[in-house]
């Protein structure tokens, strides 16, 4: 499925100015349950078919695909508006793509765990400063703020 494209008029020795762009946007989704290493989960538009997804991945991204399975996920309708009317989220299609033999995919770890660093010396002095009295106002308790 492509946008309506207006092709330029023919020119002698005419260069190829046509660029194919799809109307589909697919999202790579981290699976909720454990999947085999050769299976990748996508969220795709309702209009997209298995054949469209296979061609999309093979032609644009050069990803070899063995099989494509799809299912329709119904949108939640638990939310209610100010008039107590249910608000339904739109349905979407989930595709499970099995990669060709020998291909594996592991979801990237975007936010790795950081190693605990040594505490900042200023953070260590802060509780001590709070406990000490203000030298500008001797004899006044610390709870009596300025």
From Swiss-Prot:
Name where it's found. Mitochondrion
Q: Which GO terms describe its molecular function?
A: structural constituent of ribosome
Q: Which InterPro entries does the record cross-reference, listed alphabetically? A: Nucleotide-bd_a/b_plait_sf, Ribosomal_uL23-like, Ribosomal_uL23/eL15/eS24_sf
Where does the protein principally reside?
mitochondrion
Q: Which Pfam families match?
A: Ribosomal_L23 (PF00276)
Q: What keywords would UniProt list here?
A: Mitochondrion, Ribonucleoprotein, Ribosomal protein
* Presence of the UniProt keyword Ribonucleoprotein in the record: yes
Annotated region Disordered: the residues are 108-146
Task: List this protein's GO terms for biological process.
Answer: mitochondrial translation
> Gene3D superfamilies, from UniProt?
3.30.70.330
A GO CC annotation recorded here is: mitochondrial large ribosomal subunit
User: Oligomeric state and partners?
Assistant: Component of the mitochondrial ribosome large subunit (39S) which comprises a 16S rRNA and about 50 distinct proteins.
Which family, according to UniProt? Belongs to the universal ribosomal protein uL23 family.
- Designated name of the protein: Large ribosomal subunit protein uL23m
Q: What is the lineage of its organism?
A: Eukaryota, Metazoa, Chordata, Craniata, Vertebrata
Which gene is transcribed and translated to give this protein? Answer: Mrpl23
